[in-house]
Amino acid sequence: MEQGQIGEIEEILINAFPAVEREIYDGWILNFSGGYTYRANCIYPFYHSTYDLEEKVIYCENQYRELLLPAVYKMTEAIPKALDELLEVRGYKNVKYVDVLHCRLEGWTAPKMKCPEHDYEVIRMHRMDEEWLEGVNQLIDIPY
């Protein structure tokens, strides 16, 4: 996958379920949500940066430490190799892998899913609604 495509998909994912607090620091996006989910509590080294790489990593670590959160980086193939190497030297480890699958939905209709006890339906939305948010909060045990 090309870097431009990765960037476009990552922007969609970042905005799909935003963090409670967000800081932009020299092209990096720092998300803070009290520890609920990696995606809402991680550092996206997303855009081009100009500051010294090691100083940026130390700054980010301090920001998360102040909130008693681990500094977690969302890494993709588009991330500069120098950052990956620096994080490894500083003792960071790969903790979780995420596969992002995508396809064109133009002209696609969701099949009705059925099981003996229930009748499920796939609903495609452009924005989350209250019912969806409440369900997600119950699944990951966030007070609602």
Residue ranges of predicted features:
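Short amphipathic alpha-helix that is part of the acyltransferase structural core
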Residues: 1-11, 39, 44-45, 98, ...
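N-terminal charged segments
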Residues: 1-66, 79-80, 84, 142-144
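Bulky hydrophobic/aromatic packing residues
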Residues: 16-18, 23-29, 91, 98-100, ...
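Acyl-donor-binding surface of acyltransferase catalytic domains
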Residues: 49-130
